[in-house]
């Protein structure tokens, strides 16, 4: 019971914190920053925070050779998921993008069933069908217009990357590695993707106001360090599929901030779609 309460609390914290992505990212976009620059600073600031936590707990940074490759792959998957999600904000409302992202539990369940032969429960299948129905409602608005195809594909790419990460944490040697250490190296290796893209483009946008730096720090703390820590620990405790399915608060948080702060519309059709998905 204690373990169940702990995991439940961690999932609430994870969902609430990860749903804050639009809250801190959109003001940075408005100030002229691009997704690569935002994510570079997001990961860069999160890494030392986790390093301090590891040191404060007296843990070692040492990893075994067999853990290096899985950590690199997991890092690149998380970075790719972040990049495609943040790119999608340029094509659709952040609340809708974050809601569409919640198809990743379906992908996790399918991967576990098809690759690792995990039996799909009837309730899981029903949940998957309801989520697909919700996506259908979101894809076409009440005025007949459809969501951006590019934006939708970007969100689905983000969902797939995140789903593979959640499965990978539980199906590799990383399952028995300390959560803090896994998260630290995942973000460290993930940072390399944004470094490479920035070196290729030759452009790194930096904030020109103190409160924008505060936004970057908040991005590093809440939807990055805290969220990924809780996700990794939950996967190690209860497995990939339950962790994914228990993430219902994530899109709710994103939609709440999108509507209340950024003036995104909340129609009956959108509400029905969100309810079906979560």
Predicted regions and their residues:
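Membrane-interface interhelical linkers
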Residues: 9-10, 16, 47-73, 114-125, ...
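Single conserved hydrophobic/aromatic residue that forms the stacking wall/gate
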Residues: 1-8, 13
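Helix-capping/transition residues at the boundaries of transmembrane alpha-helices
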Residues: 29-30, 89-90, 116, 173-174, ...
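Juxtamembrane helix-loop-helix junctions in multi-pass membrane proteins
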Residues: 16-45, 164-189
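Hydrophobic residues within alpha-helical transmembrane segments
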Residues: 40-45, 69, 73-76, 103, ...
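Hydrophobic transmembrane alpha-helices of multi-pass small-molecule transport proteins
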Residues: 50, 72, 111, 120-140, ...
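Hydrophobic alpha-helical transmembrane segments of multi-pass membrane transport proteins
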Residues: 16-20, 24, 53, 72-91, ...
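Specific alpha-helical transmembrane segments that line the substrate/conduction pathway
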Residues: 37-48, 77-78, 86-119, 124, ...
